[in-house]
Amino acid sequence: MELNTLKSTFINNFGKEPNSLFFSPGRINLIGEHIDYNGGFVFPCPITLGTFAAASLRDDRICRAYSLNFESLGVIEFSLDDLSYKKEDNWTNYLKGVLKVLIEKGYKIDKGIDLVINGNLPNGAGLSSSASLEMLIVKILDTFFSLNISKVDAALIGKEVENTYIGVNSGIMDQFAISLGEKDKAILLDCNSLYYEYVPLNLGDNSIIIMNTNKRRELADSKYNERRKECDDSLDTLKKYTNISSLCELTSLEFETYKDKIEDSNKLRRCVHAISENERVKDAVKALKENNLELFGQLMNQSHISLRDDYEVTGKELDTLAENAWKQPGVLGARMTGAGFGGCAIAIVNNAHVDEFIKNVGQAYKDAIGYEASFYVASIGNGPTEL
């Protein structure tokens, strides 16, 4: 259905059939939260929700773009000769940013495109709708102009667009998880070295349920910066006593030796989270390789508790979802995912219990919070593809 709407919208706006259809996923992080900047591992995977596109190559230097998610904006038009950021160009700044970065890197792009997109990722929910769009655009341009961009380079290009063009200080995880995504696999990634490893994620009779608090992450940025500073300060203190360059180089056992050097109790708890979370990621990967989904679920639960009690980034909404999820039959594990303070939580739920799970957790959330959460059943999909 979505593809038919996409095609008909393309024909209505541009008077012809599109050359090609494309899809780019969103992502979740299964475990390994708030440790990418502490030298730790993240463990994301692409999901079957994402951004769809219909696109055609033009024979001039004009780009025309229309989004079914922002219909009131109509068709936004610009030329390859002016790729400067303009606030009024809204979401198409991502298209302009990717074009600008690619052209500056010497890729030959000499014609414009017509583009219609439609995403089914909720905006502002922490499922990486912007990285999904960036990787979609790279895929389209790579296909149309035969640019031969590697998957790792595609991720780095997306990060550069975010950092230098859009002006968001994001890391590499989102673009990497999407660009290198493979069906039924998660990616163990060290964001500093870009070392990565695919880990098969066979969920058997279970699905991933994404639970959206429907609370925008308005606190996330200020608290995120605060947490980073607390970790950086702690690292500076520990460096006086041990030769490390990041918190996650320490094991919990090693940290026991030095923890009395951190006098501030808040900073101490931040360290405890970072170091224990990195160990949980390694344990989670081992559990999956041994097909031990039960242990994997328990580690997810422990991760949420650590983020709630030691890192203090969950908040009432995410806690309500996770804590009610734990009580339901057929649940292997549940935790917040992303930056916290709103956004989404995830649960791994037996397929026979999914409907009951959504009904029970949804009702408990509405009773406690006063408005509804949204639920999405997702599986682990491929990276950006031409359909």
UniProtKB/Swiss-Prot annotation:
Which molecular function GO terms apply here?
ATP binding; galactokinase activity; magnesium ion binding
Q: Which InterPro entries match?
A: Galactokinase (IPR000705), Galactokinase_bac (IPR022963), Galactokinase_CS (IPR019741), GalKase_N (IPR019539), GHMP_kinase_C_dom (IPR013750), GHMP_kinase_C_sf (IPR036554), GHMP_kinase_N_dom (IPR006204), GHMP_knse_ATP-bd_CS (IPR006203)
Biological processes, Gene Ontology terms: galactose metabolic process
Q: Which residues are catalytic?
A: 174
Q: Where does ATP bind?
A: 67, 124-130
**Single GO cellular component annotation?**
cytosol
Which UniProt keywords are present, listed alphabetically? ATP-binding, Carbohydrate metabolism, Cytoplasm, Galactose metabolism, Kinase, Magnesium, Metal-binding, Nucleotide-binding, Transferase
State the top-level EC class. Answer: transferase
Q: Which residues bind Mg(2+)?
A: 130, 162
Question: What pathway, per the record?
Answer: Carbohydrate metabolism; galactose metabolism
Query: At which residues is there a site annotated Transition state stabilizer?
Result: 27
Q: What is its EC number?
A: 2.7.1.6
Which family does the entry's similarity section mention? Belongs to the GHMP kinase family. GalK subfamily.
| Stated role | Catalyzes the transfer of the gamma-phosphate of ATP to D-galactose to form alpha-D-galactose-1-phosphate (Gal-1-P).
* Name recorded for this polypeptide: Galactokinase
